[in-house]
């Protein structure tokens, strides 16, 4: 809705995302998120130096693995380093979007879920998607993953999907992300950041639902800050008296 700054981070090394997001750009290995996650310590300057800014959307930056990198390119990623990466990125921009895989054994996914203020879960509305969720739900039972607060969307939804039945099994959908040929083409042809032009009203409504949730969280944070400032001011006045 506005042009506040954001960084999109994907740390799934089985499919390096920089050449998928930006196939027309030659991105050197030294721009890889692997360089950051394998560092001794992660700070804002290190993160800023490994962000690739989108030419079409200069307020959006991306971080991911570079072309040709694989699981043996770097030492095993540590959970704590992912948290450091997220915290450092959050100090640089207004929003950090963590693009997770469905693989919970990749430490980036559980660490991202733990650190996320708003978690969006996208499932295919079929038996495969539903059973994936049922299988992984026990892994997210710890309170730090705030499982019950996640938003769940039906992704790649098609007219023949049993949306109501699948939704009943998982407790309901927060919205639909319908399949669209144009969106699929954007993803497969390297134009992923152009896909917003082809979103139908149901897709857009789901995106707006996410934005509304973020706005509500921001308002709640501002209200809490104001209340804290008022309390501090009252305590100072009481001390003066």
What do the PLM-derived regions correspond to, one by one?
Residues 76-83, 134-160, 195-198:
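P-loop/Walker A phosphate-binding loop and immediately adjacent motor/lid segment at beta-alpha junctions
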Residues 154-160, 164-197:
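Beta-strand-loop-alpha "switch" segments that mediate conformational coupling across diverse proteins
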Residues 189-241:
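NTP-binding/hydrolysis catalytic cores, primarily Walker-type P-loop NTPases
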Residues 95, 118, 172-175:
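Well-ordered beta-strand positions
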Residues 91, 107-126:
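Inter-motif core of Ras-like GTPase G domains
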Residues 2-61:
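Phosphate-binding loop that captures ATP/GTP phosphates
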Residues 9, 64-65, 97-99, 120-125, ...:
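Conserved beta-strand segments of the P-loop GTPase G domain that flank and frequently precede/overlap
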Residues 43-57, 61-105:
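Cytosolic-facing regulatory segments adjacent to core modules
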């Amino acid at each position: 809705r506005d042009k506040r700054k954001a960084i999109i981070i994907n740390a799934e090394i089985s499919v390096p995302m920089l050449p998928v997001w930006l196939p027309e750009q030659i991105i050197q290995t030294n721009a890889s998120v692997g360089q950051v996650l394998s560092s001794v310590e992660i700070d804002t300057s290190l993160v800023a130096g490994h962000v690739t800014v989108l030419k079409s959307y200069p307020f959006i930056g991306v971080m991911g693995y570079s072309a040709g990198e694989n699981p043996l390119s770097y030492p095993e990623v540590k959970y704590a380093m992912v948290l450091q990466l997220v915290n450092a990125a959050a100090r640089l921009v207004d929003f950090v979007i963590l693009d997770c895989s469905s693989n919970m054994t990749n430490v980036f996914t559980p660490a991202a879920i733990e650190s996320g203020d708003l978690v969006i879960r996208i499932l295919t509305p079929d038996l495969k998607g539903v059973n994936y969720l049922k299988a992984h739900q026990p892994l997210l039972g710890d309170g730090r993953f705030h499982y019950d607060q996640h938003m769940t969307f039906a992704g790649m939804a098609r007219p023949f999907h049993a949306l109501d039945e699948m939704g009943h099994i998982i407790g309901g959908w927060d919205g639909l992300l319908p399949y669209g040929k144009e969106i699929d083409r954007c993803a497969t042809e390297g134009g992923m950041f152009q896909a917003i032009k082809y979103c139908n009203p149901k897709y857009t409504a789901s995106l707006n639902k996410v934005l509304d949730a973020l706005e509500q969280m921001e308002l709640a944070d501002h209200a809490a800050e104001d209340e804290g400032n008022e309390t501090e001011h009252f305590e100072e006045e009481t001390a003066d008296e």
